[in-house]
Amino acid sequence: MSAVNTPAGFTDYKVADISLAAWGRRETIIAESEMPALMGLRRKYLAEQPLKGAKILGCIHMTIQTAVLIETLVALGAEVRWSSCNIFSTQDQAAASIAAAGIPVFAWKGETEEEYEWCLEQTILKDGKPWDANMILDDGGDLTQLLHDKYPQVLDRVHGVTEETTTGVHRLLDMLAKGELKVPAINVNDSVTKSKNDNKYGCRHSLNDAIKRGTDHLLSGKQALVIGYGDVGKGSAQSLRQEGMIVKVSEVDPICAMQACMDGFELVSPFIDGINHGTEASIDKALLGKIDLIVTTTGNVNVCDANMLKALKKRAVVCNIGHFDNEIDTAFMRKNWAWEEVKPQVHKIHRTGPGDFDAQNDDYLILLAEGRLVNLGNATGHPSRIMDGSFANQVLAQIFLFGQKYADLSPAQKAERLTVEVLPKKLDEEVALEMVRGFGGVVTQLTKQQAEYIGVTVEGPFKPDAYRY
């Protein structure tokens, strides 16, 4: 797609500035050259049109890389309506280029909470009425939740949802356990080519970039505390170590904690003896008083709570690279401390009280992206080559679920198919192979004898489902 002029009469969009479309198109063309798996799928399935008839409601960060995803879905036959899953993550030139191509999109950087909710609604509604959508592509679960809560009739036609991130998967599993989930879901997050690329290697690239853009600080020689050591935490700790920081890790899971130790990070707790009693007395003030940077990576609530924020070193930087803004207790900061905007998505939080502040006061914290996703709030997120794997998984998951035609099944068949599952390993390997080819790599093929010896086929899949990469 190369159009940059909005089709005559097309008004089914809202973006910051449609005149940015040409800029967005130029960046999209570059991104396509860095997304070999996604573009490979576009070429492979173009003639087949496996998404013909698919009407996809999409809610994922409206970035340049997402523009390539959207146009791949459309190229394979789908119609889409789109919004962003974060109020700060949209790249306005990307949204403009999609609108200029005649694709409904409702997203701009710096939305208010009310505007965010409005954009979600417009994704679902066409001409004021629910669109006859039959697929969902989500990141974080807000769109899926809104459909279940307010537009359940739409779900009668929906074949399934593909979910991008850890937080959204947790919400889906919770809904499934409570009997509230109405459609099957593919857990894209736990595909190897998503979790190991996006969550780990992506954060390794983009966290330090966002912090440096937001603060202009030299990070070398300073002390950082990374809260959480899952895939996002692992990538984040590596990102800061690359900058020469002295990195400590806090974890609740003994296995992840062991991995942090094995990777050479000091395992600590912000709480004395590791126990949070909800009081200032339980805080390890000696530890937090030396921390220059704290990063939350968990997808959990209040992992950097009010008592920790009180004990942090003066002028420490605080940020989050998990999906939602509740990992850091920003509600406490808004209620009790004064906020001074330095520039968009960078605030000095004066710990001298909620009222007026002295600009020369040195008892403040630097909060990035208001506690929301820092790498997209203060920078441009993961590079195209990283998102290539994630979005190739999304395309294959959409094709897979759309082909299952869940909405057309009998009640008995629906009950059997109502699951939250990962993408079949063979498709995960298909994405990986396209990515390897994009790097110019050559994968060695097993001989028939070798394949028989380890109990697989020459074409794969090569590992059992329980294998941990």
Curated annotation (Swiss-Prot):
PANTHER family: ADENOSYLHOMOCYSTEINASE. GO terms for biological process: L-homocysteine biosynthetic process; one-carbon metabolic process; S-adenosylmethionine cycle. GO terms for cellular component: cytosol. Its cofactor is NAD(+). NAD(+) binds at residues 165-167, 199, 228-233, 251, 300, 321-323, 375. It is an enzyme of class 3 (hydrolase). PROSITE patterns: ADOHCYASE_1, ADOHCYASE_2. Substrate binds at residues 63, 139, 164, 194, 198. GO terms for molecular function: adenosylhomocysteinase activity. It comes from Pseudomonas fluorescens (strain ATCC BAA-477 / NRRL B-23932 / Pf-5). Pathway: Amino-acid biosynthesis; L-homocysteine biosynthesis; L-homocysteine from S-adenosyl-L-homocysteine: step 1/1. InterPro entries: Adenosylhomocyst_ase-like_sf, Adenosylhomocysteinase-like, Ado_hCys_hydrolase_NAD-bd, NAD(P)-bd_dom_sf, S-Ado-L-homoCys_hydrolase_CS. Belongs to the adenosylhomocysteinase family. Keywords: Cytoplasm, Hydrolase, NAD, One-carbon metabolism. It catalyses: S-adenosyl-L-homocysteine + H2O = L-homocysteine + adenosine. May play a key role in the regulation of the intracellular concentration of adenosylhomocysteine. It comes from the Bacteria. Its EC number is 3.13.2.1. It is found in: Cytoplasm. This is Adenosylhomocysteinase. Binds 1 NAD(+) per subunit.
